[in-house]
Amino acid sequence: MCYDKTDYRIIRYPEKKKWKYQRCDGRIYMRRRDREVTELNEIIHILDSGKVLHLGLVDQGKPYIVPMNYGYVMENDKLVFYVHGALEGRKLDIIRSNSDCCVQIECDVQPFSGKVACQYGCSYYSFDGFGTAEIVEAPQEKIKAMSALMKIQTGKDFEFNERLVSIVSVIRIECDYYTAKYRPLPANPVV
């Protein structure tokens, strides 16, 4: 039974013969709740440490994923990502017809081995966000976006003007919800 939006329930989908875990607000949550990252400082660590965001879009019912450099800001308690690229292309065409998207970032990936094949794996932090994408047209927002992107990618502040941002497209991705995960190294890893 769900009492508030932080409670969980398990739902059986007979047609798929499997169970799904769902938050009471309707969002699917991760199976390994012991690995879920909920502390904002840890989530910020993931966002600040990762350099590549994988942008997932849907093109005529088919998945389309593209790796991109990114920047992010918090606006009105919403996480907003910015990515940039050419002024024309497939991803812009897709966003114009279907703005639904997801993003994925990982960092601190460290492979480890074991005595048997099933003990091999990777320690990592990961972030998955779900929301909508839109193409930014306003020069001032493009300047803000490019500044955020360069700060994450280089740790430096750069000056932009309308002429510089007029030659790139900027995509704004507003996350409606997200999850983050940490898979630690095993107790006695063979690294």
Task: Annotate each predicted stretch with a short phrase.
Residues D25-R32, D108-V191:
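Charged, gly/pro-rich active-site loop segments
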Residues Y3, I10-S49, V191:
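Extreme N-terminal tail/first-helix region
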Residues K51-L53, V66, D77-L79, S97-C101, ...:
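A generic structural signal for short beta-strands and their flanking turns/coil linkers
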Residues L57-D59, G85, I105-C107, C175-Y177:
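Short, structured patches in soluble enzyme cores that scaffold and shape functional sites
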Residues G50-L87:
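Short beta-strand segments
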Residues D48, E88, R96-C101, A148-G155:
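Short, intrinsically disordered, mixed-charge
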Residues R90-S113, C118-Y120:
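Helix-adjacent hinge/juxtasegments
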